Amino acid sequence: MVFELIRPAPLTEQKRSRDGCIYLYRAMKFIGWLPPKQGVLRYVYLTWTLMTFVWCTTYLPLGFLGSYMTQIKSFSPGEFLTSLQVCINAYGSSVKVAITYSMLWRLIKAKNILDQLDLRCTAMEEREKIHLVVARSNHAFLIFTFVYCGYAGSTYLSSVLSGRPPWQLYNPFIDWHDGTLKLWVASTLEYMVMSGAVLQDQLSDSYPLIYTLILRAHLDMLRERIRRLRSDENLSEAESYEELVKCVMDHKLILRYCAIIKPVIQGTIFTQFLLIGLVLGFTLINVFFFSDIWTGIASFMFVITILLQTFPFCYTCNLIMEDCESLTHAIFQSNWVDASRRYKTTLLYFLQNVQQPIVFIAGGIFQISMSSNISVAKFAFSVITITKQMNIADKFKTD
């Protein structure tokens, strides 16, 4: 099977939570983010890393700016909006990539905590849940890959077949106006640069979802362990107390896991929140007023890409808050009424800690949730309204 990891492995195989990140880290290795620790190959690899950052993270946003400075008059309204919507996202993507790469050590360290959490997953039901979340996480990354690559490929083909480069980046060496061959060469070079940038952007957008999907699986397993507390009559009171202490330690490990990944997630999502409304607004204006059928298809793929950057993760954040509430209910409804005083005291301490939900704060300003995501996305309709009221679209068409 080509994509073996998108299906749950049989229980005869030993899977770990970190295996849910396999596709993610393979892509990181391909784009130059995970160099060998030593040897000559490390320096060869770092050269590749430098090239990807120079071309995909630095040149791409500057290439848009250069094209606006040198050939803005040659843009049609539709071409300009197609370029502008990606330009704004490219600057945001460069910021997100810088944040993710500089804090990559946090994501790697979080996998070590997952290994500690896996030590408690000995029951057959728990192993089955780990296998399921491993498949689901890798499947999610694969969906991101198809959508992001679909956008880049559809824009490339639709633009070239229409007789123009896909993004019209500044290129002082090749003039695409000098014949079909140079058009294809310039367009292909743009596509290669954009493909690298798209992969970098995909890594920055998909890791929050993957890491929180795994988090939810461990919250679910912890909830089931809490429900089983003092339900086994073969265990003594001291052994039941030890099981409770283990649940408390599991929760502390989960909080440590969240504390490590929060700074990375909060920075990248905050950057995306700042841009999503504006980018969606320009894209929808392009679709409604200036697009032909081919540009419309490419713009539609771009809209899906933009929505994938935040909506799945924000929805998962809502589910995590519900999971935390379910933990509280599980503790309260567990078999504690006739327990010892020491057991009840520890359980009360546990309950007080669990009542504080796990939340992610974008940029330390506002909570990441579906409501906040919808609020920032609504800005797109404000951009469209301003365009209609000022009659900007008709003025562009007239000019």
UniProtKB/Swiss-Prot annotation:
Membrane-crossing residue ranges in chain numbering: 46-66, 84-104, 141-161, 179-199, 269-289, 293-313, 357-377
Family (UniProt): Belongs to the insect chemoreceptor superfamily. Heteromeric odorant receptor channel (TC 1.A.69) family. Or2a subfamily.
Extracellular side of membrane: 67-83, 162-178, 290-292, 378-399
Function per UniProt: Odorant receptor which mediates acceptance or avoidance behavior, depending on its substrates. The odorant receptor repertoire encodes a large collection of odor stimuli that vary widely in identity, intensity, and duration. May form a complex with Orco to form odorant-sensing units, providing sensitive and prolonged odorant signaling and calcium permeability. Involved in the behavioral responses to ethyl acetate and pentyl acetate.
Membrane topology: Multi-pass membrane protein
Residue ranges, Cytoplasmic side: 1-45, 105-140, 200-268, 314-356
Biological classification of the source: Eukaryota, Metazoa, Ecdysozoa, Arthropoda, Hexapoda
Compartments where found: Cell membrane
GO biological process: detection of chemical stimulus involved in sensory perception of smell; sensory perception of smell; signal transduction
InterPro entries given in the database record: 7tm6_olfct_rcpt
Presence of the UniProt keyword Nucleotide-binding in the record: no
Identification of the protein by name: Odorant receptor 42b
Assembly with partners or alone: Interacts with Orco. Complexes exist early in the endomembrane system in olfactory sensory neurons (OSNs), coupling these complexes to the conserved ciliary trafficking pathway.
UniProt keyword annotations, A-Z: Cell membrane, Membrane, Olfaction, Receptor, Sensory transduction, Transducer, Transmembrane, Transmembrane helix
GO CC annotation, single: dendrite membrane
